[in-house]
A protein has these predicted regions:
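C-terminal substrate-binding/cap subdomain adjacent to the FAD-binding core in PCMH-type
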Residues: 3-22, 29-35, 196-366, 381
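C-terminal segment of N-terminal export signals and the immediately downstream linker at the start
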Residues: 4, 24-67
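Glycine-rich N-terminal segment of FAD-binding domains in flavoprotein oxidoreductases
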Residues: 32, 43, 64-165, 179, ...
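Short loop/turn motifs at secondary-structure junctions and domain boundaries
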Residues: 160, 188-192
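Short glycine/threonine-rich loop-to-helix capping motif typified by GTGT followed
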Residues: 286-290, 335-345, 392-405, 457-468
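Activity-critical C-terminal alpha-helical subdomain
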Residues: 340-346, 353, 440-490
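Substrate-recognition/cap regions that form aromatic- and gly/pro-loop-enriched pockets
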Residues: 347-452
Length: 490
């Protein structure tokens, strides 16, 4: 363990790139840097396999995210060369009471992974995957591995994780910290429900292996725990047989309630392996175009899809059915060309004041209709409105909160606003708060990957019966409260 430096003591044993850190001032709660940018041997910090960065470009990048709304500037960014680096630096930050946040792909929209005056740990270098064999039932991966890479590595052996988010270029550690929802949840639960073990660095700098049967309190406090009790550095994921091809259906509906009812029927009956839906604006700007997306997996995981059996009894417009077969990975990665086009058009730099709500099935149509009636195409911009039907009994992770009803819906309004239009961003943030309150009034909550202003009291309400266990785990595993302050929970 590194010794505590004196008030203006030099820090030894670390090579820092960019602006060189020459000392930490506990009274001022800051690290001093030289302007020379030369690499310098410093005192007190542990030696690292990776690098610590305090240059302007690194700090500016870490003070931004996909939302481009919140900006909290750290004093340093760690690019670890090993898990040992994460352990050592978290231990040092705990000694000095410096806040710490891990950052995967920077896809958070509201400053969740930012940290003012502290240390950001980039997890992308921790991206090992495997080994995987033909008969494997699990795979162990680094927290910085992207789901696209995990899919490719496992598909080489005819295997796949059972649940994916629609966008594959997210880090494993990032989605496991929030939940990991997609169109397969009604069959397999969330991504967090398909984890068999973790390696975690606690807020005290302890490296811990945990699972449902070993240090289970930490295991359950970290999955969907928003980084409050530990930093995931490695996860063991469940694997299932992968289909070779899938059949993708798109069904059109005239009204919201029928659209949601048919989603409910499909997940209750388990006809499809993937169910999702979109709502878009009609020619007059009203959000009345409803498209249900459903996917049936083919051999070797299931029989060849039978169109008549799969679509029987549904109330879509039969004249507008679109279906097609495609390779499984192409289906998983179907957003890739859209993302590439968005980046080329500059949309990736837009502000993203996202609304993500968990709505109880009995109130989903009423609450979402009110929100959609107030939404304009200009508010949504080049974004999208999504519905995912969820079955309560498949969601077993305590900190992944949803309604108590059998069927809930994840309702997403994923707006994209030109970055200089701060008035619209502020207005949408206010609207997001109002929408959350409407959801909470009927037993819903947020899925915490969006941009909803939240207080500490809101978080206690959000976690509900799970709050005492989370609070206890926070005291045990992050007693000085240094981890992920950007969530605003404690």
């Amino acid at each position: 363990m590194s010794r505590t430096p004196s008030r203006r003591g030099l820090l030894r044993g670390l090579t820092v790139t960019g602006a060189a850190v020459i000392g930490f001032d506990p009274a001022a709660r800051s690290w001093a840097v030289t302007a020379s940018g030369s690499a310098t041997e410093l005192a007190g910090l542990p030696r690292l396999d990776g690098t610590l960065h305090a240059d302007h470009a690194s700090l500016t990048a870490a003070a931004d995210d996909y939302g481009h709304i919140v900006h909290h500037r750290p004093v340093a960014v760690l690019r670890p060369g090993s898990v040992r680096d994460v352990v050592s630096m978290v231990r040092f930050c705990n000694e000095q009471r410096l806040p710490v946040a891990p950052r995967g792909q920077g896809h958070a929209p509201f400053g969740q992974a930012q940290v003012e005056g502290g240390l950001v740990i980039e997890t992308a270098p921790l991206a090992d995957i495997g080994p995987v064999g033909k008969g494997s039932t699990t795979v162990t991966v680094g927290a910085g591995a992207r789901w696209s890479a995990v899919a490719k590595a496992t598909l080489a052996h005819g295997l796949t994780p059972p649940v994916f988010t629609d966008y594959l270029e997210l880090s494993v550690g990032g989605t496991l910290s929030v939940g990991g929802l997609g169109g397969q949840v009604h069959r397999h639960g969330a991504q967090v429900d398909n984890v068999t073990a973790l390696r975690v660095v606690t807020g005290a700098g302890e490296l811990v292996r945990c699972s449902p049967s070993r240090r289970s309190d930490l295991f359950h406090a970290v999955l969907a725990g928003l980084g409050q009790c530990g930093i995931i550095v490695e996860a063991t994921l469940r694997l299932v047989r992968a289909p070779e091809t899938v059949r993708h259906y798109r069904l059109s509906y005239d009204d919201l309630e029928t659209f949601l009812d048919d989603q409910r029927v499909l997940v209750r009956e388990g006809r499809f392996d993937y169910v999702e839906g979109q709502v878009s604006a009609d020619a007059g700007g009203a959000f009345r175009v409803h498209t249900l997306e459903a996917v049936a997996y083919g051999p070797p995981t299931g029989p060849a899809p039978d169109d008549a059996a799969l679509l029987r009894g549904l109330r879509h417009d039969p004249s507008t059915v679109h279906s097609g077969d495609l390779p499984y990975y192409d289906f998983l990665d179907r957003l890739a060309p859209l993302v590439a086009a968005d980046k080329e058009a500059g949309v990736w730099t837009y502000a993203h004041p996202w609304l993500n709500l968990m709505l109880p099935g009995s109130s989903a149509a009423t609450v979402s209709a009110r929100i959609l009636n107030a939404l304009t195409p200009a508010d949504l911009g080049p974004g999208v409105v999504l519905f995912y039907p969820l079955l309560r009994d498949r969601l077993t992770t305590p900190l992944l909160r949803t309604s108590d009803e059998e069927v809930s819906y994840l309702f997403d309004v994923l707006s994209a606003v030109p970055p200089d239009d701060t008035a619209t961003v502020d207005r949408l943030l206010t609207a997001n708060r109002s929408a959350y309150e409407a959801a909470a009034a009927v037993g819903g909550t947020q899925y915490p990957v969006g941009s909803i202003p939240f207080t500490r009291a809101d978080w206690r309400t959000h976690f509900g019966a799970a709050w005492p266990r989370l609070k206890s785990a926070k005291r045990t595993y992050d007693p000085r409260g240094i981890l992920v302050p950007g969530q605003g929970i404690f």
